[in-house]
A protein has these predicted regions:
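N-terminal charged helix/coil linker that caps or initiates catalytic domains
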Residues: 1-27
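Electropositive phosphate-/nucleotide-binding environments in soluble metabolic enzymes
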Residues: 11, 15, 32, 36, ...
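A structured beta-alpha segment of the ubiquitous adenosine-cofactor-binding alpha/beta core
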Residues: 75-117
Length: 119
């Protein structure tokens, strides 16, 4: 890591708490208003493993409510736009981006990843 960019988090929760965050596995279904904000917050908190799932593209109408949406990425897959954003915050993060629509019949990719939490 570049220095210890999570040192303030570590001061708050201790080194054991930070290690737990860095080993946590969280899946996020949808990168809209809630999912894109959750993804960024979890990344900035130090959660080390994120699975981000969304089949949609960034639209101009998303600008008013979605952190992933900027004019620069209109037309991009939301997973690609979110990857650009998260990697600029934490380039060493273990992020998996899946540009698919989650359905019961294709659930294997989610459960094979073994998340501790799903947003």
């Amino acid at each position: 890591m570049d220095g210890n960019w999570l040192q303030r988090t570590e001061l708050l929760i201790g080194s054991e708490g930070l290690a737990r965050l860095q080993s946590a596995r969280v899946a996020i279904l949808g990168l809209g208003g809630v999912g894109s904000a959750a993804a960024e917050a979890l990344c900035r908190a130090g959660v080390g493993h994120l699975l981000l799932i969304d089949h949609d593209r960034v639209d101009l109408t998303n600008l008013n409510r979605q952190l992933v949406a900027t004019r620069e990425v209109v037309g991009w897959r939301k997973t690609d736009a979110q990857e650009k954003r998260l990697r600029s915050i934490c380039p060493e993060g273990d992020f998996t981006f899946t540009p698919e629509f989650y359905l019961p019949e294709n659930h294997a990719f989610l459960f094979d990843w073994s998340p501790a939490f799903v947003v």
